[in-house]
Amino acid sequence: MAALLMPRRNKGMRTRLGCLSHKSDSCSDFTAILPDKPNRALKRLSTEEATRWAESFDVLLSHKYGVAAFRAFLKTEFSEENLEFWLACEEFKKTRSTAKLVTKAHRIFEEFVDVQAPREVNIDFQTREATRKNMQEPSLTCFDQAQGKVHSLMEKDSYPRFLRSKMYLDLLSQSQRRLS
């Protein structure tokens, strides 16, 4: 499970990305270590990149800093489990080993989908039951319906609030001030 949810547990990364949600002198330029190159040079978030996140929810999800900023926002709303589930499903779809697929599927189900799961996502009864049935023979698509529901929920609910949030607006403002 640790490998599956590693981005959440990487304290150094969380600390550095935490500056996306705080205004302090130490991180007012919104720098973050590249997730694929930890302990290397810092990269600045450009105004263009941050502005593109408003184009669509999928654009936001395709950008590593967009995901980090959205995660920080969701934490303030106590709903980061939705994004964590979506990311876990994306990672799960890359699984090639049948043995690992079954193990990962059960971990994701127990962590996010099952009733009273530690980080239970908000999905309807039919979707939860369909996903439960899919667990009898897990496949790369066993979470597609639940993941789609969570994606829609975030896109229609959390994403518009994120774009209006002080956090996002401050991030845009800070990146624009750097250009001046």
From Swiss-Prot:
GO BP terms: G protein-coupled acetylcholine receptor signaling pathway; G protein-coupled receptor signaling pathway; negative regulation of signal transduction; positive regulation of GTPase activity; regulation of dopamine receptor signaling pathway
GO molecular function: GTPase activator activity
Gene3D superfamilies: 1.10.196.10, Regulator of G-protein Signalling 4, domain 2
Topological category with respect to the lipid bilayer: Peripheral membrane protein
One cellular component (GO) term of this entry: neuronal cell body membrane
Keyword flag Iron-sulfur: no
Residue positions, PTM Phosphoserine: 26
Pfam families assigned to the protein according to its UniProt record, in alphabetical order: RGS (PF00615)
Source superkingdom: Eukaryota
UniProt-annotated location(s): Cell membrane; Membrane; Perikaryon; Cell projection, Dendrite
Keywords for the protein's UniProt record, in alphabetical order: Cell membrane, Cell projection, GTPase activation, Membrane, Nucleus, Phosphoprotein, Signal transduction inhibitor
Domain RGS: 56-171
Role noted for this protein: Regulates G protein-coupled receptor signaling cascades, including signaling via muscarinic acetylcholine receptor CHRM2 and dopamine receptor DRD2. Inhibits signal transduction by increasing the GTPase activity of G protein alpha subunits, thereby driving them into their inactive GDP-bound form. Modulates the activity of potassium channels that are activated in response to DRD2 and CHRM2 signaling.
Assembly behavior: Interacts with GNAO1 and GNAI3.
Protein name according to UniProt: Regulator of G-protein signaling 8
Organism in which the protein naturally occurs: Mus musculus (Mouse)
